[in-house]
């Protein structure tokens, strides 16, 4: 998992 994917997941969760 890369930073872009992590950022996208965080945006979905938050």
UniProtKB/Swiss-Prot annotation:
Domain of life: Eukaryota
GO terms of biological process kind: defense response to bacterium; defense response to fungus; innate immune response; killing of cells of another organism
InterPro entries recorded: Mastoparan
Effect of mutating residue 6 to K: Loss of antimicrobial and mast cell degranulating activities. Mastoparan-17; loss of antimicrobial and mast cell degranulating activity
Any one Gene Ontology molecular-function term assigned to this protein's record: toxin activity
A Pfam family annotated for this UniProt entry: Mastoparan
Family affiliation: Belongs to the MCD family. Mastoparan subfamily.
Free-text tissue specificity from the UniProt record: Expressed by the venom gland.
GO CC, any one term: membrane
UniProt KW keywords: Amidation, Antibiotic, Antimicrobial, Cytolysis, Fungicide, G-protein coupled receptor impairing toxin, Immunity, Innate immunity, Mast cell degranulation, Membrane, Secreted, Target cell membrane, Target membrane, Toxin
Usage in biotechnology: The potent mast cell activator mastoparan-7 (abbreviated Mas7 or M7, which contains Ala at position 12 (K12A) and an Ile at position 13 (L13I)) can be used as a mucosal adjuvant to produce an anti-cocaine vaccine to induce an immune response that could attenuate the effects of cocaine consumption in humans. In mice, this preparation induces the production of high-quality neutralizing antibodies, reduces cocaine penetration of the blood-brain barrier and protects mice from its psychoactive effects.
Additional notes on this entry: Mast-MO, a derivative peptide with an extended N-terminus (the FLPII motif is N-terminally added) has antimicrobial and immunomodulatory properties. It exhibits increased antibacterial properties comparable to standard-of-care antibiotics both in vitro and in vivo, and potentiates the activity of different classes of antibiotics. This derivative targets bacteria, and rapidly permeabilizes their outer membrane. In vivo, it displays direct antimicrobial activity, leads to enhance ability to attract leukocytes to the infection site, and is able to control inflammation.
Residues carrying Leucine amide: 14
Protein name in the entry: Mastoparan-L
Localization per record: Secreted; Target cell membrane
Function: Antimicrobial and mast cell degranulating peptide that interacts with lipid bilayers and activates G-protein coupled receptors. Shows antimicrobial activity against some Gram-positive bacteria (S.aureus MIC=5 uM), Gram-negative bacteria (E.coli (MIC=50 uM), S.enterica), and fungi (B.cinerea (MIC=8 uM), C.albicans (MIC=25 uM), C.albicans, C.glabrata, and C.neoformans). Does not show antimicrobial activity against Gram-positive S.mutans.
